[in-house]
Structures are given as C-alpha cells and as structure tokens.
Regions:
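Conserved P-loop NTPase-based nucleic-acid remodeling module centered on helicase motor cores
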Residues: 102-193, 198, 202-208, 215, ...
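Acidic, low-complexity intrinsically disordered tails
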Residues: 1-52, 297-305
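Interdomain hinge/linker at the junction between the two RecA-like core domains of SF2 helicases
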Residues: 340, 345-346
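Phosphodiester-processing cores and adjacent nucleic acid-binding clamps
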Residues: 93, 102, 341
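ATP-binding Walker
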Residues: 81-82
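A conserved segment at the C-terminal end of the G1
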Residues: 88-92
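Basic/charged alpha-beta structural segments of nucleotide/phosphate-handling enzymes
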Residues: 3-6, 13-14, 18, 23-24, ...
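Conserved helicase NTPase motor core
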Residues: 51-67, 71-76, 85-87, 99, ...
Length: 355
C-alpha cells in the first residue's frame, strides 16, 4: 500500500522511511528553490500555448471541464475517463489562455507520485512555468503553510513532524505515565481514535469537554480524553506535530486568523482537488477555507474589499473511495451540490482504457 507521500517528484528529493519528503521535515524546502513571487513568475515566460491545440483531441465533456469558468465545478470521472489529462489541460489552459500566474494555482493530489505526474504533464504543455505551481498532497501543502505561520499557534517554524511510528511511541509513553496496562489499553487503538478525532477537527479540549462527566461520557472516553490532552501537550513541548495535526492546525489557523486566510485566498485563485471522494472532513474544511465564500473565516459579502471565492474544481468518483480507513467520506462528493449550490457537474463517462 502506498503512503500519502510515496514516490516524491524529482524536485522534492529524498523521502524519510515514513515516506515524507525530507524538505517537509525541516524549515528549508522547495520554496528556496522555487520562489513564488509574482515577479519571478512573470519572468518565467514559458512557451506560448494555443488554446485550440490544448482542446484538440478532447471529447465534449472534457473540453467543457477544461474551459469552465466561474463557480465551483465537480467532475465525476470514472476509471479510464481521462481525468488526469483533463486536469493537466485545464491547468495549462489557465496559464496559457486565461493569464493565470503559476503561483495562483494550488492542485492537490493524494500521493507525491500523482503530483509529480501532474507537474510533468503540465510542464510538457506550458514549459518550465509549471515549476512554480503548488502541486502536492494535502499534507505537503499544509507543511508549507505551517512553516510560514507556525508562530500563530506557538510553534517554531522548524517544528518536527511525527510519523505513525513516532506517534504511537509517544502514545505508549503517555499511557504508561497514566499507569494503564498496554495489554488492556492498546496504544495503537488510542492513536487511531485520536487520529479519527483530528480528522473530524475535534481538538483535545473540545473532546474533554464533551466527555468530561459521567452523564456525557464513559470511563473509556474519559481515559481517551486524558490521553489525548497529554499527548498533545507533549507534542507541543517537543515543538512537533503529527500527520493529522498538519491539516487540523492549518484549518485552525485559517479560521482563527482572517488575515492569514485572506492572504492564501488572494494567492490561490484556482484550487483543484483530485480524488475528492477520498477526502475526510478536515481536508474538506481545509479546501473550503482556502476557497473562501459564505461560511468561511472573515468572509462578509457586503464588504467591498472582501476576496471573492477562488475557482474550485474537484474530481471524484463516489464508487472508488479507497481511503475510508483514514476517515474519508464520500459524503463530500455526494453532497457537493448542497455545499456549493452554484456548482456545476460534468460527467466524464467514456472509458478510454476499454476502447
């Protein structure tokens, strides 16, 4: 089974044993190699892209997905329907025809392998400008944001990232200090429950308040609450975050600091998410906060200076969710139109692998 960070693209360099790009583990990263300023992006001229050439060979539905402009777009794409090609051509169309800067694009995939493939495809269409885009996993994108915003939550920018093994080892120490028998109270089970809570954006204080009395929680739940609080405290003492913290903490910052949310909404005017059916609740909220609009941090439609919502394009297939064990819920794809009432849906139905 692959990890969220497996097979990093060439520019990411080596990965740790846990599969995290080594640049994500330290303060220095690809930002040093790929400066994201507008001046730098404009200097990277790239090659001219003919819109008709980009659209050539696409069927009607694929063309519509590539040139869509305006409100949110859900692309429902079955296996072999050419969704990767559509995403790559859409990004190239944004860069070559609509005048979008590479740094204004955030494309989220579920593996670094997919991110590398996407970047290579776009580079093949528009040239080296593709290097300035953010094409990466949810976790990698959050690492880059958190390196910049760490002080907002009392962290140093060189915070460590605990992988699953590190997290379980810390949980074992926490349970030992609570005098709990590891044979009866399995550290892995506790870690899994904490992960589930974070995927639902339930922090340690919220959970403790929820189960803090005999009327509202069981003895087991109160033990979990104590373990969760102690675990988080020890993470912070070590200037560290675990995998699930990367997303939850980024969401917390975006929601608590409207100026930070506005900064990234102004930056990322085009957000594309692949395999949307595999997103969990925390990832869904992260996308919503980055896009902006009603119900998000700092948004007020009657404020003249408010940043309008970015263009959101998500691709998914409700029949293919493979990350349920990580808290993914196909509710996010099934209720997309409810969450975004002005959304358009395009079906990619032709299977090119079987023709």
């Amino acid at each position: 089974m692959t990890t969220l960070f497996d097979e990093s693209p060439e520019w990411a360099g080596a990965v740790t044993d846990a599969g995290i790009p080594t640049w994500a583990m330290t303060q220095e990263g690809p930002a040093k190699r790929h400066r994201d300023t507008e001046a730098g992006e404009r200097e990277a001229s790239g090659r001219h892209t003919d819109p008709e050439a980009l659209l050539g060979g696409l069927n009607t539905q694929q063309r519509e997905a590539v040139i869509h402009e305006g409100g949110p777009l859900l692309i429902v794409a079955g296996a072999g329907s050419g969704k990767t090609r559509v995403l790559a051509h859409r990004i190239a169309y944004l860069l070559g025809h609509r005048g979008v800067l590479p740094g204004q694009i955030l494309a989220i995939t579920f593996t670094n392998k997919a991110a590398g493939e996407m970047r290579e495809r776009v580079a093949g269409l528009v040239g080296p400008r593709a290097k300035a885009m953010w094409v990466m996993t949810f976790h990698s994108a959050c690492v880059r944001i958190l390196r910049r915003e760490a002080s907002k939550v009392g962290l140093k920018s060189n915070f460590s990232i605990y992988d699953a093994t590190d997290s379980q080892r810390l949980m074992s120490l926490v349970l030992r200090d609570m005098d709990l028998d590891p044979k009866r109270y399995n550290p892995r089970a506790f870690s899994h429950q904490v992960s589930n809570l974070k995927n639902e954006l339930v922090d340690e204080e919220t959970y403790a308040a929820r189960v803090g009395s005999e009327e509202t929680g069981t003895h087991q739940e109160r033990l979990l609450a104590e373990a969760y609080r102690t675990y988080q405290r020890r993470l912070r003492q070590a200037n560290a975050l675990d995998f699930d913290d990367l997303i939850m903490t980024t969401v917390n910052i975006l929601q608590a600091f409207p100026d930070v949310a506005e900064h990234y909404r102004r930056r990322f005017r085009h957000i594309l998410v692949d395999e949307y059916q595999d997103t969990n609740h925390a990832q869904y909220v992260l996308v919503r906060e980055l896009v902006g609009g009603p119900g998000t941090s700092g948004y007020a439609a009657d404020t003249p200076s408010v940043v309008p919502p970015g263009e959101l394009v998500v691709v998914g297939d409700a029949d293919q969710s493979i990350y349920a064990f990580r808290g993914a819920t196909i509710r996010n794809i099934e209720e997309f139109e409810k969450d975004y009432p002005d959304a358009r849906v395009i079906l990619l139905e032709q299977n090119y692998r079987s023709t």
